[in-house]
Amino acid sequence: MEERSKIRVGITHGDMNGVGYEVILKAFSDPTMFELCMPIVYGSPKVAAYHRKALNLQTNFSIINSAEEAQNDKLNILSCTDDELKVELGKPTEEAGKAALDALEKALSDYRDGLIDVLVTAPINKHTIQSESFHFPGHTEYIEERVGGGNKALMILLK
């Protein structure tokens, strides 16, 4: 019998100046996470490396250019932002809002194209993400409009 492929989980990096990368990097520092899924982080390898160093973590990741390149047993980082982003931890910036929206749009496109099975979103700043193409109270409403179909699912897990 052929082994079932792991679920392909798209994870947006959220506000790059917030807790998104910390949560992602710490979660995937546990190798058992890779038994559950194939993670594809939509964001910036440069920003991920910045957070990894700031948090003194050893979490390894692979840089990919498309979701099709993702590999099992690796934290795959799909670059979908400008490489010259400036991280300012804890500070709301327009640049962070644009990076959050860029990651969300790419992840939703890949979801619609069947390249990822589910989407997990890191927290965004609801003020800095506002732009000409984003006039929503938050990204949940944005996702609902973009994906459509009348099927709504939202899960919030807290520990």
PLM region descriptions:
Residues 1-159:
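Anion-binding alpha/beta catalytic cores of soluble intermediary-metabolism enzymes, centered on
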